[in-house]
Amino acid sequence: MTTLFNQPLNVINVGIAMFSDDLKKQHVPVTQLDWTPPGQGNMQVVEALDQLAEKPLAEKIAAANKLALERIIQSHPVLVGYDQAINVVPGMTRTTILHAGPPVSWENMCGAMKGAVTGALVFEGLAKDLDDATRLAASGDITFSPCHEHDCVGSMAGVTSASMFMHIVENKTYGNRAFTNLSEQMAKILRMGANDQSVIDRLNWMRDVLGPMLRDAMKIIGEIDLRLMLAQALHMGDECHNRNNAGTTLLIQALTPGLIQAGYPVAQQREVFEFVASSDYFSGPTWMAMCKAALDAAHGIEYSTVVTTMARNGYEFGLRISGLPGQWFTGPAQQVIGPMFAGYKPEDSGLDIGDSAITETYGIGGFAMATAPAIVALVGGTVEEAIDFSRQMREITLGENPNVTIPLLSFMGIPTAIDITRVAGSGILPVINTAIAHKDAGIGMIGAGIVHPPFSCFEKALLTFRDRYFL
């Protein structure tokens, strides 16, 4: 015992970081081990986890989750076309505005979403200017609904209106379809809350030139295998949420023969190619629709604890669970932590927003950051942290997708099928990398970073699942 006190002190601190912080101030070597008790100490959650682990319920959950995992992995999404939302999106009307995240009223919409809504109303000709659009949005005459409830996903504000052209992605394995609108690229754009005349002019051009060209090109091409293209893009250094250099190159390569043969004037062809070349984000929405098509195939499986939706609207974060179809489990939207563009401060940023977390729900984006170490230049952190995120996410998922792999981790399949019981039991929250929109309407993107869902979403989902299935 006496020799113990004559040796250098090396401390491992488990849990509360204040103890390790105090030791560091005294120049004592200390290793901080992040740990939280199951359920983050909530005994109701711990009790629910114990109840769900009892037979025969645990066996039913395991069988349901095996099926959900299989459906995600076996899903084979392909791009089959483009068309206007009014023609293809279930439930779309001329006075419907779809938005990102769980349901939200006009009064509770954040600045970026309100900016996008008013811009869309002007674009659709439903309002003569932004002031008129604000009055219309508040009047009750416009139907607001989540994209996810219409087989859609929407980037950032996610605002989708009748005239906008949509990707049409079909799951060849199960037959379901998913939709998302086109990338406006990375300038002052509607999805970030900008809504001045330059934004409206771009939307008009996308409706009148870009959309029809893509539609007619796909009539010639037939279909594009998105699952194969995704796997290639990850092997080329993308994570296919915020880094899309390879994916956009592959997508425009596949589209080019059809675009050239579609019969449009050379001047318009040049406009389209210059537009695509202006930003690597052109393929970003494509991956979102691909992931949505795969995850919807796993939604609605009785007894399954698999997360099929993670989405944010700048006000709340929402989850949907396979075994509890039609229900949202929400918590407060979080602050995104990451580098800001020059001239902006963290206090300028809006809260977490967008349906693009469907990529992480599928297993790419933040879950696949080990494929894209260069992403840290945009979202912050280190290469080592990016790699660790991919390893850590495997702890809260049911398996790996062998169709989409991570070369740096010995070609491990992407972590697939987030399980609410694993999240609740471990305290490990899904990691999401995302853009940051300004808190006020009319400005746009001001940075990017890392964010996690609030634990309360998983807590609510778990307790509701227990109440539904534990008899």
Where are the predicted features?
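Anaerobic metallocofactor- and corrinoid-dependent redox/one-carbon enzyme cores
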Residues: 2-471
